[in-house]
């Protein structure tokens, strides 16, 4: 049977295509928008059955042009949290997703989709409950609104619907995201270009570089998606983060030490890195004051209750792997 991946040339989508290939799956229809043509590089080492532009996909999907479809991994979206064109964002992330969902429900196709931790916005709790969801931008709202649709249809759906609230994902195949790429990606490039990594200084009671995020490797994101793909009886909206908040200092320090290791230099403590000027703290920008999350951490209770029991990579493990991959691409 056929599998469909939307956003297939993007960060998470291309990692899913590659992982499906490694399982022997090649009857994959890749759907994307290659207006930004450089994304094609993410699919060069992947095997797909066909490629479709997103503008023609839904109508052909509705008509049944692809025969028997087992599942769709719906990763296609505008993920730029700085996008201010609300009409574009809602058409791309909400309306388009509803159309894909409607076809899946009508044809009993597994529907696994990308939600986002941006649905929580200014909340201090990160549990999949309506009362703690406070999106701060139109991107978060587009994901939040679609999740509300899912909550309404879940009780009567006859096929799987699984949504994943991605936290701060990092890993291979994100180069095309440019300024929206992960902190690890930018730290890697900054250190290679300038010989140091710059982090925000003290803010809102957090010491320099100690603001925290739930950083999750794309390796783990793919594993969770495939777990639900293999278990079509499990539905719901699930946080997809490591469940562990770690400071930006951990990212920067791991990037520095991994690059030092690749240069046959010994690892240094964070204090030594700061003392040597390898990590530098800059004043917290006035433009971000009052708009910046100093802490995120996925509550994994619902994910674990669904039966996913594999451990998640720590920043030290995942970023080390990622930096070595990036270094190999240079």
Curated annotation (Swiss-Prot):
Note the SS bond partners. Answer: none
Pathway recorded for this protein: Nucleotide-sugar biosynthesis; ADP-L-glycero-beta-D-manno-heptose biosynthesis; ADP-L-glycero-beta-D-manno-heptose from D-glycero-beta-D-manno-heptose 7-phosphate: step 4/4
Q: Which GO terms describe its molecular function?
A: ADP-glyceromanno-heptose 6-epimerase activity; NADP binding
Q: Keywords in UniProt for this one?
A: Carbohydrate metabolism, Isomerase, NADP
Task: List required co-factors.
Answer: NADP(+)
One Pfam family from the record? Epimerase
What Gene3D superfamilies would the database entry show?
A: NAD(P)-binding Rossmann-like Domain (3.40.50.720), UDP-galactose 4-epimerase, domain 1 (3.90.25.10)
User: Which amino acids does the record list as binding substrate?
Assistant: 168, 179, 186, 200-203, 213, 292
Look up keyword Cell inner membrane and say if it applies.
no
The protein's enzyme class: isomerase
InterPro entries linked to this entry = Epimerase_deHydtase, Heptose_epim, NAD(P)-bd_dom_sf
Provide one Gene Ontology biological process annotation: carbohydrate metabolic process
List the catalytic activities from the record. Answer: ADP-D-glycero-beta-D-manno-heptose = ADP-L-glycero-beta-D-manno-heptose
Cofactor descriptive note: Binds 1 NADP(+) per subunit.
Q: Residues that bind NADP(+), according to the entry?
A: 11-12, 32-33, 39, 54, 75-79, 92, 143, 169, 177
EC id = 5.1.3.20
Q: Which residues form the active site?
A: 139, 177
* Record family assignment: Belongs to the NAD(P)-dependent epimerase/dehydratase family. HldD subfamily.
**Subunit arrangement?**
Homopentamer.
State its role.
Catalyzes the interconversion between ADP-D-glycero-beta-D-manno-heptose and ADP-L-glycero-beta-D-manno-heptose via an epimerization at carbon 6 of the heptose.
Free-text note on domains in this protein's UniProt record: Contains a large N-terminal NADP-binding domain, and a smaller C-terminal substrate-binding domain.
- Report the HAMAP family cross-referenced here: Heptose_epimerase
Name-wise, this protein is ADP-L-glycero-D-manno-heptose-6-epimerase
Q: Which organism is it from?
A: Paraburkholderia xenovorans (strain LB400)
